[in-house]
Amino acid sequence: MKKTLFIIVCIILSSVAALAQDYRQAFVDVQQEFEQRLPGTLGHLQQYLKDYPYTTYSDEVQLMIGVLATEKGNYKQASKVLEQVARKNLSRQAVPMWYFYSGYAYIQQQEYKKALPLFLELKKQQTLYTPHAKYYAGYCYYCQQDFAHAMA
């Protein structure tokens, strides 16, 4: 009886380990597709969330979906998706991307008061997005007719 129970436990544990490898590899695959902006990436990201609904990468995948929506000009959808992302669950490299694309989607919807704090926070960081954040923060001030801050 103990031997049978031991075998069953071993099988279950090996299955769990294999499943963990599957969701990690699937994430790496969709992440590479996203980085290359391959056709069909959006569908693959959405399918990943369906296949692995409790993955630790769900916020990263949601971020990618929001970025793609922003790049396609679907700003309202992008904002909706990006607002659901828990920033604390993102990798350190992904956080500046979240700030930038969230702010940019707001600007495109003329929601400057929502966009401005995101760009101001991003200005404090040294990332690829920092020069853009400086410009868009000034633009937000300008659109709100705060010309003194816009020129700073």
Give the location of each predicted region:
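Acidic, polar-rich low-complexity tracts and alpha-helical solenoid repeat scaffolds
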Residues: 1-10, 18-152
